[in-house]
């Protein structure tokens, strides 16, 4: 699914499902399209159907990763046993928000509250 910037009237985003795109074309951000608008009787919302790409938008160019990140990624070793490890521990809390649970455990009958 996706959304079309629909600039007629109150200028909003119009939902469309990928099945509504004609000829199986994969749309990209910036593509110009033609479509029909339908009203869903159940939800009362409009959506686009019979979506055709009129012309392709500008190709998106991915920004290169910053040098500091590239250098950091090169230095990571996943199987280094001597690397520092982080382990987060927290004490359990009782139902009354007290720290931990009592060491004494009572045997209770099912369905009996004391």
UniProtKB/Swiss-Prot annotation:
Pfam families: CSD (PF00313), SUZ-C (PF12901). Its main location: cytoplasm. It is found in: Cytoplasm; Cytoplasm, Stress granule; Cytoplasm, P-body. InterPro entries: CSD (IPR011129), CSP_DNA-bd (IPR002059), NA-bd_OB-fold (IPR012340), SUZ-C (IPR024642). SUPFAM superfamilies: Nucleic acid-binding proteins. Gene3D superfamilies: Nucleic acid-binding proteins. The modification Phosphothreonine is found at residue 77. Keywords: Cytoplasm, Phosphoprotein, Repeat, RNA-binding. It comes from the Eukaryota. GO terms for molecular function: RNA binding. GO terms for cellular component: cytoplasmic stress granule; P-body. Residues 1-51 form the CSD domain. GO terms for biological process: stress granule assembly. Residues 64-105 form the SUZ-C domain. PROSITE patterns: CSD_2, SUZ_C. The keyword Isomerase does not apply. RNA-binding protein involved in translationally coupled mRNA turnover. Implicated with other RNA-binding proteins in the cytoplasmic deadenylation/translational and decay interplay of the FOS mRNA mediated by the major coding-region determinant of instability (mCRD) domain. Required for efficient formation of stress granules. Belongs to the UNR family. Component of a multi subunit autoregulatory ribonucleoprotein complex (ARC), at least composed of IGF2BP1, PABPC1 and CSDE1. Interacts with STRAP. Part of a complex associated with the FOS mCRD domain and consisting of PABPC1, PAIP1, HNRPD and SYNCRIP. The interaction with PABPC1 is direct and RNA-independent. Interacts with EIF4ENIF1/4E-T. This is Cold shock domain-containing protein E1.
